[in-house]
Amino acid sequence: MMLHIPGVLTKAQVAQCRELLDAAEWIDGNATSGTQSAQAKRNRQLPEGAPAARAVGDAIQDALARHPLFFSAALPLKVFPPLFNRYEGGETFGTHVDNAIRLLRGTDFRVRSDLSATLFLEEPDAYDGGELCVEDTYGTHRAKLPAGDLVLYPASSLHHVTPVTRGERVASFFWIQSMVRDDGDRTLLFQLDTQIQALSAEKGAKDPMVISLTGIYHNLLRKWADA
C-alpha cells in the first residue's frame, strides 16, 4: 500500500525547517548508501550527525507522533531518525530497494525497515522531475507532493527518483519498523480502522457495531503485533 499523508508539517514549519537545512553543509549522498544503492544514487545528503539534521528530524518525529493517519497506517514501533537529501542539475536515484536493516551509526539502535517514508520539503511547481516512483504488482505509482506532505510505502518495493531538470528537490526520508511486520496484515488493520472511524463519526462511539468492530480490530492487533 502506498499512502499520501497530507499536512505532516504546516507551511510555516516547512519554512523553519528549510531555513536550517539551507544553511547547512551537504555531502555526497552515497555516504549512507548500501552497495546496490551506490550504483544508482546521484544526489546530496545532510550528514546524519549535523545539528540541522537533528533539529529538523526531531521536529518531524514530533509531528508524526501527533498525526493520527500516520499512526493508523504505520503502527510504528521504531522510527529511524529522519535523513535529508536534495537533487538538482539532473541528479537522480535509480531503481533500488532499501536495506532491510538500518543501523544508526555509532549506536546499537537498529530498525527493521518495514515501511519507507518521504516527506517533501519543496513545492512541486518549484522543480521539474524529481518524482518518487514506486513499483508493485499493480504497476508504477508516482508521488510529487506539496511541501509538508508525506508518502508512505512498503520498504520492500523497488523505487526510484526521476532526474531533477529544473530547480531543486529537497526532502526528508526515513524508515519505520511497524508493530505489524506483514504489509498485508497492516493494510487490513488500516482499512478496518478507517471504517471504524467513519462509522463512529456517523453513529457515535457508543454504537454497538462500533464497539464490536473496535474489539475485532484490537484482537487482530493483539494477534499480529510485536510490541
From Swiss-Prot:
Note describing how the cofactor binds: Binds 1 Fe(2+) ion per subunit.
Top-rank lineage group of the source organism: Bacteria
Pfam families found in the cross-reference section: 2OG-FeII_Oxy_3 (PF13640), PKHD_C (PF18331)
Positions of 2-oxoglutarate binding: 169
Fe2OG dioxygenase domain span: 78-178
Requisite cofactors: Fe(2+); L-ascorbate
Entry-linked HAMAP family: Hydroxyl_YbiX (MF_00657)
Name listed for the protein in its UniProt record: PKHD-type hydroxylase Bcep18194_B0892
Species in which this protein is naturally found: Burkholderia lata (strain ATCC 17760 / DSM 23089 / LMG 22485 / NCIMB 9086 / R18194 / 383)
